[in-house]
Amino acid sequence: MANKIKENKYIKEVLPSLTDARKRRTSEISIKDFYLDPKYINLGAGKYYMLKTYGCQGNLADSEKIAGILEMLGYTKTEDELKADFVLFNTCAIRENAEERVYGELGRFQQFKKKNPDMIIGICGCMPQEEKTIVSIKKKFPQINIVFGTHNISSIPEYLYDVINNQKKVIEVLSVEGDIYENIPVIRDHPKKAWVNIMYGCDEFCTY
């Protein structure tokens, strides 16, 4: 496998690979139903999550799914930064100012984590899909517990389980398209509006 994979007591690491990304046009995609392993049920019981979303409507749609998964785990949404047990940044890589805002927020939450070492911080979406961004995140923000890209939202329960129970940091950014998962629970931000994906993925590799 071209992706660099490293796993020990503290970290699981799968980094983006341009070589693997070029295989997107020929790789087969499977469509599966989302399934929650019983061992993940109540993983977030009594805990709070904060979800910060940047970028396009596609990210908004993904964040609604992320919220659905987290609440399925027992987490409750909060806007109180000091109350949050899990903070996840769903990011955009097209505009430089959006990336700079994320870096600024990561630095700010680093201070919160010093006061609350049990706070879990994660970053997902388009920024981690960039090779240079992963290097920057690992160097500047070692306090981040979870990093994943655009293809593996369905794995959030597994990542949280590893951080909480196995004391691991997880970096898993897939370069090829992951499987498409249907019937992921969704928490809508508006009672009469919904973001609906009409396509998934891209056959190129971001070089913004």
Q: What kind of region is each of these model predictions?
A:
Residues A2-Y208:
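Proteins enriched for Cys/Gly/acidic motifs involved in redox and nucleic-acid/cofactor modification
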